[in-house]
């Protein structure tokens, strides 16, 4: 049996195949790096995730300003905490997608629900752009009335109870807030 393949030396064919494989692998790595470092990559990922979530049977989330029929029970701390975290996350997602006004509404809701509003505002001042933070601050005056409408009489009953989420400013923020910060840092 001959050591040639189609007239080429077998070792040369193996060498050529190895070089072609390495070149293809380098090509893949180069374009993957270029794709990931593209300025609009993270926006495309967010849009793709939203499209998949929408196609997966999840109902689109309605803004709280439009009247949320499924307002959490203000006497249940776990529901309020879940609602608080949802408002923060939804607000940041909307702002990242370019919908600053609607995102500001949700973040203002979270700020008003938080027991330590000033500390939370200082966190948002550090993490949001100046325009986004200004939009949140402008939403704060109308947020109290909006939340009163959303929660109705239950808010009056729970007003004398301690806040559901507190951050005293000493040390790191609560784990839930830190998780949100870490999650959004991954997307930046």
Swiss-Prot record:
Pfam families: MAS20 (PF02064). It is a single-pass membrane protein. Residues 42-73, 156-188 are annotated as: Disordered. Residues 58-67 have a biased composition (Low complexity). GO terms for cellular component: mitochondrial outer membrane translocase complex. One of its GO terms (molecular function) is mitochondrion targeting sequence binding. GO terms for biological process: intracellular protein transport; protein import into mitochondrial matrix; tRNA import into mitochondrion. Residues 32-188 are cytoplasmic. Its main location: mitochondrion. The chain crosses the membrane at residues 13-31. Residues 1-12 are mitochondrial intermembrane. Keywords: Membrane, Mitochondrion, Mitochondrion outer membrane, Protein transport, Transmembrane, Transmembrane helix, Transport. InterPro entries: MAS20, MAS20_rcpt_metazoan, Tom20_dom_sf. Gene3D superfamilies: Mitochondrial outer membrane translocase complex, subunit Tom20 domain. Disruption phenotype: RNAi-mediated knockdown results in impaired mitochondrial homeostasis with the up-regulation of the mitochondrial unfolded protein chaperone hsp-6 and impaired daf-28/insulin secretion. It is found in: Mitochondrion outer membrane. Central component of the receptor complex responsible for the recognition and translocation of cytosolically synthesized mitochondrial preproteins. Together with tomm-22 functions as the transit peptide receptor at the surface of the mitochondrion outer membrane and facilitates the movement of preproteins into the translocation pore. Forms part of the preprotein translocase complex of the outer mitochondrial membrane (TOM complex). Belongs to the Tom20 family. This is Mitochondrial import receptor subunit TOM20 homolog. It comes from Caenorhabditis elegans. The gene is tomm-20.
């Amino acid at each position: 049996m001959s050591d040639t393949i189609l007239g080429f030396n077998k070792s040369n064919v193996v060498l050529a195949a190895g070089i072609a494989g390495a070149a293809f692998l380098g090509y893949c790595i180069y374009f993957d790096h270029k794709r990931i470092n593209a300025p609009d990559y993270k926006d495309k990922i967010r849009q793709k995730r939203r499209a998949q979530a929408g196609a997966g049977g999840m109902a689109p989330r309605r803004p709280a300003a439009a009247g949320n029929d499924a307002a959490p029970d203000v006497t249940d701390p776990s529901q309020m905490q879940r609602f608080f975290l949802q408002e923060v996350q939804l607000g940041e997602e909307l702002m990242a997608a370019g919908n600053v006004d609607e995102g500001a509404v949700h973040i203002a809701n979270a700020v008003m629900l938080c027991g330590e509003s000033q500390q939370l505002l200082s966190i948002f001042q550090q993490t949001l752009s100046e325009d986004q933070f200004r939009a949140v601050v402008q939403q704060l005056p109308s947020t109290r009335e909006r939340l009163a409408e959303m929660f109705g009489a239950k808010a009056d009953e729970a007003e004398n109870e301690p806040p559901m989420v507190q951050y005293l400013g000493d040390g790191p923020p609560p784990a839930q807030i830190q998780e949100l910060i870490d999650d959004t840092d991954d997307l930046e």
